[in-house]
Curated annotation (Swiss-Prot):
GO cellular component labels: cytosolic small ribosomal subunit
NCBIfam families given in the database record: S18
Membrane-spanning intervals of the chain: none
Organism: Orientia tsutsugamushi (strain Boryong)
GO biological process, one term: translation
Physiological role: Binds as a heterodimer with protein bS6 to the central domain of the 16S rRNA, where it helps stabilize the platform of the 30S subunit.
Example of a GO MF term: small ribosomal subunit rRNA binding
Protein name (record): Small ribosomal subunit protein bS18
Length: 102
């Protein structure tokens, strides 16, 4: 009653299941729920975005001097616009540098 089973076929099936589970893991990481906006706390403890606070604004600027995108900083759309405007004003008033030289 024992049948002769091809081991190459079993290996192919194992590889398919491994790929399938790896794809699921990748999707779970990709579709992971984002944390809330750090600048929009519901209890009112969120910092106020203003050009007068270069310490807060510098957290959202890269080493090169560019404004970090919202997908990196997890900031909501409206706060990202406020940040961008405040950073541009702070640059014009020489509170923040336009470019960081290394």
């Amino acid at each position: 009653m024992t049948e002769n089973i091809d081991t190459a076929n079993i290996d192919a099936i194992k590889n398919k299941t491994l790929k399938r589970t790896a794809n699921r893991a990748n999707k779970e990481v990709f579709f992971r729920r984002r944390k809330g906006c750090p600048l929009s706390a519901p209890d009112g403890t969120a910092p106020i975005i203003t050009y007068k606070d270069p310490d807060l604004l510098s957290k959202f600027i890269s080493e090169c001097g560019r404004v970090l995108p919202a997908r990196v900083t997890n900031v909501c759309r409206s706060k990202q616009r406020e940040l961008t405007k405040a950073i541009k004003i702070a640059r014009e008033l020489a509170l923040l540098p336009f470019v960081y030289h290394q």
